[in-house]
Amino acid sequence: MPRVAKPKAAAPAKKVVSAKKAKSKLYKMPEKVKEGTVFTDLAKGQWRIGPSIGVGGFGEIYAACKVGEKNYDAVVKCEPHGNGPLFVEMHFYLRNAKLEDIKQFMQKHGLKSLGMPYILANGSVEVNGEKHRFIVMPRYGSDLTKFLEQNGKRLPEGTVYRLAIQMLDVYQYMHSNGYVHADLKAANILLGLEKGGAAQAYLVDFGLASHFVTGDFKPDPKKMHNGTIEYTSRDAHLGVPTRRADLEILGYNLIEWLGAELPWVTQKLLAVPPKVQKAKEAFMDNIGESLKTLFPKGVPPPIGDFMKYVSKLTHNQEPDYDKCRSWFSSALKQLKIPNNGDLDFKMKPQTSSNNNLSPPGTSKAATARKAKKIDSPVLNSSLDEKISASEDDEEEEEKSHRKKTAKKVTPSARNAKVSPLKRVADSSPPSQKRVKTEPKSTPRERATPKASPKPRSTPKASPKPQTPTAARLRTPNAKINFSPSISLRGRPGGKTVINDDLTPQPRSKKTYEFNFELDVSMDANVIVNVKRKKKADQDKATAVDSRTPSSRSALASSSKEEASPVTRVNLRKVNGHGDSSTPGRSPRTPAVTVRKYQG
C-alpha cells in the first residue's frame, strides 16, 4: 500500500513541525464546489460538477457528467490533498478495479454482474486556492441505510441472503487481488441505477482497503480499532487485516439486517473500543449460544452455519467462498425466492398464529368485537366444564330471540359455511379431541354455527305426549350432561326435541325442549347452544320420578332454590352402532343425554 515519504532526519525540529502540520490537515473537509464547475482529469477529460448528493466522513460527493452531455450519470468524489482515505481508494481502483479485470473475473466465475465499482477518471484541481484530489466513478442508487430506516432497522430475510451472496462475490474478487475491504456496512452498499440495476448491490468506499497478512499474526497498535466500531472484526481491533475479518464484518451486518441487535450495541459500549473488542471475543468464542440469545425463536440456519465457519478460520486461511454461498443459496430455495431480479426491500406483514380466528392484519379491537359474538365454547368431555348462566342473560336472550326467526337444523343442509368454533375443533390433533375454555363473566350472545355440508340422517322418533310435570327446578348447581345416546326430531319454529334413551327403557312421558343448533361432522366435536325456555304449564306441574335415587335426592334438595342452573356439557362422537331402540342412527348423529342433578 502506498505510504507517505518520511521527512529527512537532518532536520528533526522541522520534522516535529511538519508532523503537527500534517496532523492538523488530516481528514479536513473539502471546500465547497460550485455547481457548474468543470474539473479536468489526468487524461484531459472534462467533467461538469452537478449538485452535491452526499457527504462522507472526509469528503463530498457530487453528481457529474461529461462536458457536452446532459445526463449526470457519474459522480465525483473530492477531498483535500492532505487526506489519506481518497488517496488509498484511488490507488486501489487504479491497480485492482479496472473494468477489464472485473469483466474477466465475471466470465471466469460465471457471473452476470459483480458489485465491484470501477474508476472512470481521476485528477487534481484547486478549489478556493486549496489543492484537492478527485476521482470520477459511475453513479449508483440509494444505499441500504434508507431501506433499513423504512423497515424498522431490518430487511426481508430473502434479500439479506441475496446481499450476502453478492458481497461474498466482491470479497472473492478483492481477496484474489491481495486486498481486504475492512469496512462493509449498509451505508457503503449501493444499488445500481441502470436498467436492471436494482438487482445488484455494489460495495463502495475503499478508504480502509489494505493488503491482508499471509504470515505471522502481528498486532499493530497504530491500526488498532480501525473501521466502523459496531462491525469491525476482532482482528481489526488488533490492527491485523485478514480475510476472515472481512467475513466476520459481513456476519455482524447480516445479524443486524435480520432485526437482531448486536450485544455491544445493546450494552452501549461503542464509546470504548477495548470493551467492544472483549464483547466480540466473548461472542465469537461461544457463537452457538450467542446466536440463540439474539434469535430466541430460532437461529436462521445460514447465519448459524456461516458464523460458526468464520469462528473456526485461521488468520491466514483462504475462505471457502463457494461453501459460504451455498448456505445462503439453499436458504433462498427453501424460502422459494429466486436469486435474480430486483432486490425486494418491502417487508411482508407477519402473519400471527391466528389463535383468535381473526385473519392476518385484523386489529385487536375488531377481534375483541368478534369474540363477544362467539358464545359456544369448544367442550372438553374429559374435564368437568361448567358454563354459568343467569336469569338476566336468559331474559335478554329471549327478547332478542323473538326478533329473529330461529333457524331450523335439517339433516340435508348443504353448502353451509363452517363456523369459527368448528375450525378450532378441526385444527386440534386426533389425540386431543376437545379444548377446555373458561367462560366469560360478561353477558353471552348466541353464536350461529352452520349445518355440516354433508347430509346426515337422524332417527325418526314419534312425538311423545307431554304431561304436566313438577314445578321447574332452579338450583344453583343444576347440571346437564350430554353423553352417548340421543334421539332428535324437528318441530316448527326451529325447535328440536331431545329424548333421552340412554337407559334400556325410555323414561315415561319425559321430554326436554330446547332452542339450539348443531354443527356435526365425522371428525369434529359437537357445538351446542342451549337456551332454556320458561313455560307456564311446567311451573305448576308435578314431576315424574323416573330418576335414580341419587338424582332424586339431588332434585329434592335443590327444589327449594331459585337460582339459575349451571350447566355441565360433555360431548363425544358417536361410533355409529346404535342399539335396537334406535335402528336408524347414523354415525353422524350426535349423542346427547340430558340430566339435571345437584353438583
Curated annotation (Swiss-Prot):
Positions of modified residues (Phosphothreonine): 589
Localization per Swiss-Prot or TrEMBL: Cytoplasm; Nucleus; Chromosome; Cytoplasm, Myofibril, Sarcomere, Z line
The record's account of how the chain is modified after translation: Phosphorylated during mitosis and female meiosis.
EC identifiers of the protein: 2.7.11.1
Gene Ontology molecular function terms on file: ATP binding; histone H2AT120 kinase activity; metal ion binding; protein kinase activity; protein kinase binding; protein serine kinase activity; protein serine/threonine kinase activity
Phosphoserine, modified sites: 376, 381-382, 388, 390, 483, 564, 586
Organs and tissues of expression: Expressed in ovaries (at protein level). Expressed in indirect flight muscle (IFM) (at protein level).
SMART domains: S_TKc
General function of this protein: Serine/threonine-protein kinase involved in somatic mitosis and female meiosis. Required for spindle organization in mitosis, and for the establishment or maintenance of meiosis-specific chromosomal configurations, including the prophase I karyosome and the metaphase I spindle. Specifically phosphorylates nucleosomal H2A on 'Thr-119'. Required for the development and organization of indirect flight muscle sarcomeres by regulating the formation of M line and H zone and the correct assembly of thick and thin filaments in the sarcomere.
Name of the protein described by the UniProt record: Nucleosomal histone kinase 1
Naturally occurring in which organism (per UniProt): Drosophila melanogaster
Lineage, broadest ranks: Eukaryota, Metazoa, Ecdysozoa, Arthropoda, Hexapoda
Annotated gene: ball
